[in-house]
Amino acid sequence: MEYDEEEVKVLKEVLSAFFLYRQYAHTITQQKRKSMSRLSFEHKDLLLQDSDNNFLKHLSRIDQCIEQNSVLAEAIANAAIPVFCSDFDQNELFHVNVDMMQKVSSTLKQIARDWSTECVEERRTTYAPFIEELNSLFPSDSIDRSKIRVLVPGSGLGRLAFDIAVEGFACQGNEFSYFMLLTSHFILNCVKQENQFLVYPYIHSFSNHVMRDDQVRSLNIPDAVPSQYLRNSQNFSMAAGDFLEVYGTEESRDSFQVVATCFFIDTTKNILDYLDTIKNCLVDGGYWINLGPLLYHFESEGTSNSNSDSQQQPFVELTLEQLFYVMDSMGFEVLKHNSVDTTYMGDKRSMLEWIYHPHYWVCRLQKSKLRFQ
């Protein structure tokens, strides 16, 4: 792969973040120990009185979990180097900020969501509707599914795209984040057996745990080995890059029979740009399947007083009612529409879970019915 100078810099920062995970995560437990050392004698004694289950021993258990997570984080980075950045030198790691380090922790949690058995119910709620709809629209006994091209923008760690490809469709995932791209490359291409790795996704937060064991419990990943299912690589591919830039071009016009967006359409500054791009890459009569909220990621940026270049860009956040009106004007005929309740990277043992009420719809693009070209 070839990247420009700025992309190479970002890649090296992301790779460095994976290699620095061990150091960063241990810093957190070290800070906890320092904080404890400043407690009064009485308070310290309360936390240490149980010799088998005191707070310092719990921190030591977390340190052991960090070591296991580091094995996975470094395996991801090592697998990515020859493919994405062959001149990367592990002896010259880039300085990365806390935000990037937190993205490594979040990526480990995302691995659990997409590729562990424990999180299968959350995937069933959010991914199964796509599979069921595709199977209904394109029955395998009457249609050659390998001729049906499905695009999954914002494909993350590739699980939805993988599940679609397993059903026989020609599926392409698209992802912009290098954290997701490097990790999905590892899962999709490098893992050799089920449950090959342990991940401890819940150790990075000390809040809302009922039991100490809840915080330090491990999950096995992956629950499926993609390389064993996707022997015909023509049925599955991943495309790196910004959705608007990759699929808003003349070359991408009328390229897909289906676009499947899951927790995605609120990740842009101007949602109308996404609609234009979906319309561009879908064939006439093609289907757009969506499930997700409208939690606009750039809303606060759009209301800031900054004079930066990004601030000069249009920010458009529509209600669902407004969105459906615009979709109708652009030729999207809504065939199905309902809502579901789901968590996102939830923890069933936690005292706190955010419940989303995302809407699900299936649209058919009728380009002959466009009110606006």
Curated annotation (Swiss-Prot):
UniProt signal peptide: none
SMART domains: N2227
Entry's Gene Ontology BP terms: methylation
Superkingdom as given in the UniProt entry: Eukaryota
GO MF annotation, one: S-adenosylmethionine-dependent methyltransferase activity
One cellular component term from this protein's GO annotations in UniProt: cytosol
Intracellular or extracellular location(s): Cytoplasm; Nucleus
Binding-site residues for S-adenosyl-L-methionine, renumbered to this chain: Q110, R113, G154, E175, D242, F243, C262, Y274
Annotated EC: 2.1.1.22
Pfam families: CARME (PF07942)
Gene3D superfamilies: Vaccinia Virus protein VP39
Catalytic activity as recorded in UniProt: carnosine + S-adenosyl-L-methionine = anserine + S-adenosyl-L-homocysteine + H(+)
SUPFAM superfamilies: S-adenosyl-L-methionine-dependent methyltransferases
Main subcellular location of this protein, as a coarse class: cytoplasm
Positions annotated to bind carnosine: D266, H297, Y356
Keywords: Cytoplasm, Methyltransferase, Nucleus, S-adenosyl-L-methionine, Transferase
Family under the similarity heading: Belongs to the carnosine N-methyltransferase family.
Protein function: N-methyltransferase that mediates the formation of anserine (beta-alanyl-N(Pi)-methyl-L-histidine) from carnosine. Also methylates other L-histidine-containing di- and tripeptides such as Gly-Gly-His, Gly-His and homocarnosine (GABA-His).
Protein name, per record: Carnosine N-methyltransferase
Organism whose genome encodes this protein: Schizosaccharomyces pombe (strain 972 / ATCC 24843) (Fission yeast)
